[in-house]
Amino acid sequence: MPFFKMIENVSRHFSKSKKIRVALLIDEFFGGAGTAYGGYGFLARKFIAKYIPDEDIEIDVLLGKREKKGGLPSIFALKEHCDNVDLHWLPRRKFFSSLWLAAKHYDLYLSIELTDDYVLKCEKNDKKKLILWRQDPRPKRVWKTIIGTMKSIKDPCFYRQEIYQLVHDMNEEKRIKFITQGNSLNPLALELYNLENTVPISYVPNPIEIDFEYRFNLNQKNTIIFLGRLEAQKRCWIFCEIARQMPQYNFIVLGNFFRHIDDNKKMMREYLPPNNPKNLIFKGHVDGEEKKELLKSARILINTSIWEGIPISWLECLSYGTVIISAFERDDLVSRFGEYVGEVPGDGFDSVNRFKIAIDEYMNNDELYVLKATQAIEYTRSNHSIKKFKETMKHVIHSVAKD
């Protein structure tokens, strides 16, 4: 330990930068450097790495332990540059990762969830703190009694008790600042990490790019969309079956297969081109202006997932007056700005009629739809702007760095 502390102190002494050095722990960067496209990576790349660095804060992205490839010896880290941010994969050998971290002398860690413990286990400074941003805590009972009810196909269970125990231990050592994107997630986090109810958890809502110039136009809102990766827990096949049974409406799938592609395509085979119903279109992954235009024309977002936190896709859609019809609820967002059809366990095909009733209501009742759509737009502008996110997250970073 004294050796690594000496390395850190020497490195800090000769550092030209006096900024707060933040290491962002994540396992994806929304396609950057060949990583996966997902909600955590989206937050990391599009918001934290883009808007938090300033004259007082600098951020590196740590993507865990590097893989065995490229011919690079296992004692070296791997570095790439993306969007003006350095992305690092640590050496495969723990001693050299600990040495590398000491030389980098980060002031604190920031993690969107915590999907891997390699970096924190290699950190030899037992005073260094972690800001843990809760997005989607999943206790073991959730895997067993909810996600585990799926029969035809399942995503692998990524429950890892050793990570949750590490978080518990760091909390006992007063080395963690918990923040959450939704207050309804707090009981789940307390259960997952075996924490006391008195543990403080600060509210830091997820940000989205909000078009404040957008003006709601009822005449544009005529499509029904699915927005997300085509993976088992998302259960896109329910959306597709709804489309097949409701040919009077236009349905659009926005998202790609990424993990376990063959299994997921097999589950979806009767709905994919060329077998897809005429009113069901697959757009693949979309971003930028194309995505904005599709959201502007969407009247309803259908969420068929068996489990989620609070998806970024919800907030993006709400900002354009697209209401949500969902099989799960978080922070009362669905009830306020759409309709909760009730819990849907298993593969979910028996829920199609519940979705159909709600869809008909919002496609045909303009008065109800406009009321909830306009309220949704106002809500997102008041609570999920980049300006508010920057102020809140920077305050958290400064307070933890000074503590």
PLM region spans:
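Membrane-proximal helix-turn-helix segments that form the acceptor-binding/catalytic region
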Residues: 138, 149-179
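Aromatic "clamp/platform" in nucleotide-sugar-dependent glycosyltransferases that forms part
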Residues: 306
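A conserved mid-protein helix/loop that constitutes part of the nucleotide-sugar donor-binding site
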Residues: 39-46, 231-245
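Short hydrophobic beta-strand element within catalytic cores of glycosyltransferases
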Residues: 323-333
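Short His-centered aromatic/hydrophobic patch
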Residues: 111-116, 134-135
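Glycosyltransferase donor-sugar binding loop
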Residues: 63-67, 250-267, 282-285
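A charged, aromatic-enriched C-terminal amphipathic alpha-helix characteristic of glycosyltransferases
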Residues: 363-398
